[in-house]
């Protein structure tokens, strides 16, 4: 089966393959995000201390056979039951180009 990779991050993702070629995966028009709220817990003087609550993902397409999605680590962690979500591995820089050496399933 052929697999299509779609980039749901708001930026290009550069991946260096096993042959040393760097592939640029362009982003889709609307990135996937985790919807969050911040609630004040207390103040230290005038500095607020907040608690973040996660309310679900937005703009994440349903599971589709033959398609995998590059997303942020936060999106992948929130929807950890999905096996079609990929995150970039550790990033490197070479000749001014930032890239990863692969994609990771959480």
Predicted stretch roles:
Residues 2-4, 8-106:
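Intrinsically disordered, low-complexity segments enriched in small/polar residues
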């Amino acid at each position: 089966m052929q697999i299509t990779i779609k980039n749901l991050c708001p930026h290009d993702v550069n991946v260096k393959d096993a042959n040393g070629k760097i592939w640029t995966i362009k982003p889709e028009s609307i990135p996937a995000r985790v919807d969050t709220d911040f609630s004040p817990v207390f103040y230290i003087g005038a500095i607020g201390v907040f608690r973040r609550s996660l309310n679900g993902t937005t703009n994440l397409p349903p599971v589709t056979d033959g398609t995998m999605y590059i997303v942020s680590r936060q999106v992948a962690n929130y929807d950890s039951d999905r096996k079609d979500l990929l995150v970039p591995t550790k990033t490197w820089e070479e000749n001014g180009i930032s890239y990863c050496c692969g994609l990771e399933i959480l």
